[in-house]
Amino acid sequence: MPKMKTHKMAKRRIKITGTGKVMAFKSGKRHQNTGKSGDEIRGKGKGFVLAKAEWARMKLMLPRGK
């Protein structure tokens, strides 16, 4: 049986917490921020927990849970 490989997109965009939840991070913070308010930019810095329906699929992409 071949080795389980980590999905490279998932490795960069999602994270599995210590309790097993799957977190992602909001987009739209890297550049072109001049028209945005400070509250909007700070809000995009936070992660959010994905819906439980997506957890199983995301965990398949990260077989080692990193």
Curated annotation (Swiss-Prot):
In the UniProt record, does the keyword Lyase occur? no
Q: Which GO terms describe its cellular component?
A: cytosolic large ribosomal subunit
Q: Which InterPro entries match?
A: Ribosomal_bL35, Ribosomal_bL35-like, Ribosomal_bL35_CS, Ribosomal_bL35_sf
Q: Which UniProt keywords apply?
A: Ribonucleoprotein, Ribosomal protein, RNA-binding, rRNA-binding
Gene Ontology MF terms: rRNA binding; structural constituent of ribosome
Gene3D superfamilies from the entry?
4.10.410.60
Signal peptide, first to last residue:
none
Among SUPFAM superfamilies, the record links this protein to: L35p-like
Q: Which GO terms describe its biological process?
A: translation
PROSITE patterns (alphabetical): RIBOSOMAL_L35
Q: Which family does it belong to?
A: Belongs to the bacterial ribosomal protein bL35 family.
Q: How does it assemble?
A: Part of the 50S ribosomal subunit. Contacts proteins L15 and L33.
State its role. Answer: Binds the 23S rRNA.
PANTHER family the UniProt entry points to: 54S RIBOSOMAL PROTEIN BL35M (PTHR33343), LARGE RIBOSOMAL SUBUNIT PROTEIN BL35M (PTHR33343:SF1)
Name of the protein described by the UniProt record: Large ribosomal subunit protein bL35
Please tell me the species this chain comes from: Deinococcus radiodurans (strain ATCC 13939 / DSM 20539 / JCM 16871 / CCUG 27074 / LMG 4051 / NBRC 15346 / NCIMB 9279 / VKM B-1422 / R1)
